[in-house]
Structure formats: C-alpha cells, structure tokens
C-alpha cells in the first residue's frame, strides 16, 4: 500500500474535532480491545489528532507529529510505530527467519513462511480471512510488518501453498520514514 508513497501524495491536512477524536478512540478500542487500557496514553485528552488525506483515499492520523494509524476504507490500521509501543494489543503471527528479507522488501507472505519451524500461528480457531495482523519474525523483538490475511489461519495450516498475507506496511517503507513536519 505504501510502496511508492511520497509527500506529493498528501492532498490536505486538518485538525480533527474533539467529537471525531472520541469516535476514533472508540473505534480503535472496538477493533483492538486490548488497547483500551492504554488508549488515553496513546491519544492524550489534550492532544490534537491531525488528519492527513492522501492519494487513493488513504487517511493518516497523526498525534504529536507521529502517524499512529491510518485508514483505507473503513478499518483503522495501526502503524508500526504504534505497534512497537503497544505490541501485545493486536492479532499477531510470526514468520520464520527465511522470510525476513522478503517481508522487509515488501513481498506478500507465503504460507510456508508461516507454517515452517520458527514460524508461529495462533491455535484454533485462529484468525479469519481479512483480519489485520501484526507480523513478527523468529528471534526478533519488534514487529516487521502489518498485513491482511488472504485466508484464515486454519486454512493456511491445511493448504500450506500460495500467498497468505497481503503486506500493507513494513519497516523501511515510505510510511515508516514519513515525517509529518
């Protein structure tokens, strides 16, 4: 999603009203229930959320100059900077060491990268197709990427072929390096 994202893709910037800010907080908590305990730390009551409208109907939301989440259609997706602050709040999968270089170059994740030794998928029933997941790597402390499941985790285990996660955002991509100022 952010492979060719540049400053020229930004169309407008505006401050978000406090009523919309409350709605965004509620939506984040609904999508990621584990974030409820830290939502006020994440978006302090006195802080101002800035909405940055971009090309392809992408909306970035920044707090204090840092993009914390973004939206393509309806679902709010955390940025990796937010994930690194609160890693336990999101659905997570783990790829094996062999997949790291491909993930960091922006490639979609294949099923074998999630089912081999060193990889980790959640126990049954797992996650459904379309779930936004944080992608960790074997023996690495911080998340590598964020993606959307192209099939459920149980199907990934049984099929073990083809693309399983469409990458949305990864370390080193233009969103990771994007500066609001």
UniProtKB/Swiss-Prot annotation:
Domain PUA intervals: 90-172
GO BP of this protein: formation of translation preinitiation complex; nuclear-transcribed mRNA catabolic process, nonsense-mediated decay; ribosome biogenesis
PROSITE patterns: PUA
Family annotation (SUPFAM superfamilies): PUA domain-like
One Pfam family per UniProt: Pre-PUA
InterPro entries cross-referenced by the UniProt entry: MCT-1/Tma20 (IPR016437), Pre-PUA (IPR041366), PUA (IPR002478), PUA-like_sf (IPR015947), Uncharacterised_CHP00451 (IPR004521)
Highest taxon in the source lineage: Eukaryota
Residue list for modification N-acetylmethionine: 1
GO cellular component: cytoplasm; cytosol
Single annotated GO MF: RNA binding
Subcellular localization(s) per the UniProt record: Cytoplasm
Keywords assigned by UniProt, alphabetized: Acetylation, Cytoplasm, Protein biosynthesis, RNA-binding
Protein task: Involved in translation.
Subunit structure: Interacts with TMA22. Associates with ribosomal complexes.
PANTHER family, per database record: MALIGNANT T-CELL-AMPLIFIED SEQUENCE 1, MCT-1 PROTEIN
Remarks, miscellaneous: Present with 4220 molecules/cell in log phase SD medium.
Family to which the UniProt record says this protein belongs: Belongs to the TMA20 family.
NCBIfam families: unchar_dom_2 (TIGR00451)
Descriptive protein name: Translation machinery-associated protein 20
Species per Swiss-Prot/TrEMBL record: Saccharomyces cerevisiae (strain ATCC 204508 / S288c)
